[in-house]
Amino acid sequence: MRAKGGTSRGQKPGSLEAHERLVAECLEELALMGFAAWENPRRAVQVNGRWVSLTKAGRGDIQVLLARQAEGRLFGIHGEVECKTGQSGQSPKQRAHMRMVRNSGGVYIVARDRNEMRAELELLGFAARLPAA
């Protein structure tokens, strides 16, 4: 587990702040598009002196409910956004989780900026539910 303000293995100083900024920008864009979305932070507790993760490895940084209209009914589709900055790529656990979400009918997007995320959602047929600001 990383201490607050620290960095994960392989991250350069300052990249944690860039990642947090990207997550905030993507959350803002999803809100502007009219979708319910929230950050999916890593959670851990200490048990007998050891840190134990409470979250699934590989999950996206953001969870979102994507609205889809079908046969006059509104459905919420599970979606996740994995935010990547710099040259970082997905870990094997993230790729496995992405496949699981997509194979279950959900949407999993890897985004390096808010515009890329919005474009990919629109390409998948999830247009903004609210007019663009």
What are these regions, as identified by a protein language model?
Residues 1-133:
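Catalytic phosphate/metal-binding cores of nucleic-acid and nucleotide-processing enzymes, i.e., regions
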